[in-house]
């Protein structure tokens, strides 16, 4: 496969106004994508965005480029990423476009595409779009220009879709839930979903102003929701990220429930109902406690590279349905084509209702093992991981940890860093082991 110049593993992303994230590139990208997508299908594209102030600028640029290529554009306004995937499917659009940088600060933004079935755009189509980007922009004749319309009921459609994932014979009546929307795309969606299902909802992070997305709130900043759950005496908390494709939860004691624990809940519930197909896909960073807890239930577990794209690839390869990352990207292919924080939360709440259990009770059988991550900077072209000294240190630690421990060494994809991760039963022991390997890496670099 050819090297991609613009598209990364999750579309195009960067600081607004520099590099690739400029209005000029967005316009040209819209045109190039339009040229590729107009070769077949409905010639209809949906655009959604999160709440960043730059979203308006990029939306206008993409809209102009797509129209210049002859495609009709349907605007959703601020909507979660999984909502774009869902409505792309239901409108039979040729593609969906999301303008978002997910959990990044407001001064970053990104553009990614969904195919007509709501899945990430095929690599080959991305390469075709990149090839068109190299060509001069040529507008279609005036009578062939695309038209632009707005999906006025996008919010209501997606709210009903989310609620449809909860058992029809159950409600959330009696539950007090704190919902943190990260001042992002779910601010006008998530609180309504859980309220309409019967819960008492305390919403935080629900007042976006264009520059406060993910600012000390949301799934990557859990302190505020943990505090709010305790002060409000809530049963649990649900924290979403800026574009709504990631979830973290909080139990009534104010303790964080991460993506690994959510996967455990969903797998146990699916097995109890006899609907678990195969096993569960995690990543190289998934806690060993998840692996061991699933083993105890005879549920297979497989690890992919880090990134929800790779989780999806392995799910499809194994023909399994449930997978995700400890960071909160949760995939359940029986309930959607992409990570969806609101739907994942609904599925956990459904498990609680079916089993008449609290979040604490559902996670109790899974023991999260202490995990230490040490980053070691190195210089030069030499790969420290090929050093005999590093290999010997790793072998020594793995031998001492045995079956209830794990070592992972990997290079950062963006910086000259070696990431040393060690898991085991005792935090102090794990920390000592991680430092032992880190020292070996330093001496080898």
UniProtKB/Swiss-Prot annotation:
Swiss-Prot/TrEMBL cofactor(s): Mg(2+)
UniProt cross-references to Gene3D superfamilies, sorted A to Z: Alpha-D-Glucose-1,6-Bisphosphate, subunit A, domain 3 (3.40.120.10), Alpha-D-phosphohexomutase, C-terminal domain (3.30.310.50)
Keyword field: Isomerase, Magnesium, Metal-binding, Phosphoprotein
Single GO molecular function: phosphoglucosamine mutase activity
Catalytic activity: alpha-D-glucosamine 1-phosphate = D-glucosamine 6-phosphate
Gene Ontology annotations for the cellular component aspect, listed alphabetically: cytosol
Signal peptide segment: none
Taxonomic superkingdom: Bacteria
Bilayer-crossing regions: none
Enzyme class: isomerase
Entry's cofactor comment: Binds 1 Mg(2+) ion per subunit.
Record: active site: 102
Residues that coordinate or bind Mg(2+): 102, 241, 243, 245
Modification after translation (UniProt): Activated by phosphorylation.
Any single biological process term in GO: UDP-N-acetylglucosamine biosynthetic process
PTM-bearing positions, type Phosphoserine: 102
EC number(s) stated in the UniProt entry for this protein: 5.4.2.10
Protein purpose: Catalyzes the conversion of glucosamine-6-phosphate to glucosamine-1-phosphate.
Family: Belongs to the phosphohexose mutase family.
Name this protein carries in UniProt: Phosphoglucosamine mutase
Name of the gene: glmM
């Amino acid at each position: 496969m050819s090297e991609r110049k613009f598209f990364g593993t999750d579309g195009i992303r960067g600081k607004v106004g520099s590099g690739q994230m400029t209005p000029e590139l967005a316009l040209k990208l819209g045109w190039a994508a339009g040229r590729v997508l107009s070769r077949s299908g409905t010639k209809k594209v949906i655009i959604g965005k999160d709440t960043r102030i730059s979203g308006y600028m990029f939306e206008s640029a993409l809209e102009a480029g797509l129209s210049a290529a002859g495609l009709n554009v349907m605007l959703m306004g601020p909507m979660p990423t999984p909502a774009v995937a869902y409505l792309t499917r239901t409108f039979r659009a040729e593609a969906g476009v999301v303008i978002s940088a997910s959990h990044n600060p407001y001064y970053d933004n990104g553009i990614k595409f969904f195919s007509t079935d709501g899945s990430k755009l095929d690599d080959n189509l991305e390469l075709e779009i990149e090839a068109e980007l190299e060509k001069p922009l040529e507008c279609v004749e005036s009578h062939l220009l695309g038209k632009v319309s707005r999906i006025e009921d996008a919010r209501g459609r997606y709210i009903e879709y989310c609620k449809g994932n909860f058992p029809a014979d159950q409600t959330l009546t009696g539950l007090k839930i704190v919902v943190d929307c990260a001042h992002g795309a779910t601010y006008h969606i998530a609180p309504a979903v859980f309220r309409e299902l019967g819960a008492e909802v305390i919403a935080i992070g629900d007042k976006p102003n264009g520059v406060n997305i993910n600012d000390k709130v949301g799934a990557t900043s859990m302190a505020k929701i943990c505090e709010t759950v305790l002060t409000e005496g809530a049963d649990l908390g649900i924290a979403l990220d800026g574009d709504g494709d990631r979830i973290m939860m909080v139990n009534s004691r104010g303790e964080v429930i991460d993506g690994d624990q959510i996967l455990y809940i969903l797998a146990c519930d699916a097995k109890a109902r006899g609907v678990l197909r195969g096993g569960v896909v995690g990543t190289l960073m998934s806690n060993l406690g998840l692996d061991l807890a699933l083993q105890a239930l005879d549920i297979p577990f497989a690890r992919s590279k880090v990134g929800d794209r790779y989780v999806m690839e392995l799910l499809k390869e194994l023909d399994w349905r449930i997978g995700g990352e400890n960071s909160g990207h949760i995939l359940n292919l029986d309930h959607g084509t992409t990570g969806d924080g609101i739907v994942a939360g609904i599925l956990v709440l459904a498990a609680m209702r079916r089993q008449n259990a609290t979040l604490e009770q559902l996670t109790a059988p899974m023991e999260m093992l202490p995990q230490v991550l040490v980053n070691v900077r190195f210089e030069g072209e030499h790969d420290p991981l090929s050093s005999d000294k590093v290999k010997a240190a790793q072998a020594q630690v793995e031998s001492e940890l045995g079956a209830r421990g794990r070592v992972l060494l990997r290079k950062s994809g963006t910086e000259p860093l070696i990431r040393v991760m060690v898991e085991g039963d005792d935090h102090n022991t794990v920390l000592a082991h991680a430092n032992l390997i880190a020292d070996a890496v330093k001496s080898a670099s």
